[in-house]
Regions:
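Enzyme catalytic cores with a strong preference for nitrogen-chemistry domains
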Residues: 1-184
Length: 184
């Protein structure tokens, strides 16, 4: 039974307190690809030591014929340290995670104006992730602004909805508050 899904502050847990079943890290907590050995070992160790699932934002890497493509992803690590599932963000942020009309900008020789923009590939499936006997619907940041899309997770069987985001990189600006209003 999922009872506590927040991260305790230092000194908050007392001996005998129940440990969390799920540890949630934000979108892009570290600039590592999912296949980076350090990230893989760190997340697996946290899951094993805490006996909890870990959900963390990662840079997902495509495999097979799609190799070389990168996704903004949420990775689920099981309590035994195995990486069991990954959700790839579908609704990317224009001019933040991809350049709309990229070929148009190239024709106008304006590509250098947008070269700092991420070049993510959108995911294709709003899959639910298995956490114990629950099904978790995880959407990433900006996707929370589209309620019909979020509802698709519930339609796919999600019993718990989690939005991982890292609005902290906007600093002391109106952006995090704007995101909150859009998500309501």
């Amino acid at each position: 039974e999922l009872k506590k899904i927040s991260v305790p502050q230092p000194g908050e847990l007392m001996p005998g307190d129940p440990l969390p079943d799920l540890i949630i890290w934000p979108e892009s907590p570290a600039p590592f690809f999912e296949n980076d050995v350090r990230l893989h070992q760190t997340l697996s160790s946290i899951a094993q030591e805490s006996h909890a699932y870990v959900l963390a934002g990662t840079l997902g890497v495509a495999r097979g014929s799609e190799a070389g493509q990168v996704y903004n992803s949420a990775q689920l690590v099981a309590p035994n340290g195995d990486w069991v599932a990954r959700y790839d963000k579908i609704h990317l942020v224009p001019f933040g995670e991809y350049v709309p009309l990229e070929n148009f900008f190239a024709l106008l020789h304006m590509k250098k104006l947008v070269r700092e923009v991420g070049n993510f590939v959108p995911g294709t499936e709003r899959m639910v992730l298995p956490v114990h006997s629950y099904k978790l619907g995880t959407f990433i940041c900006y996707e929370s602004s589209y309620p019909d899309e979020v509802r698709e997770f519930a339609a796919n069987g999600a019993q718990l909805l989690v939005n991982i985001s890292n609005d902290g990189w906007f600093g002391d600006s109106p952006a995090p508050w704007q995101h909150l209003r859009m998500a309501r």
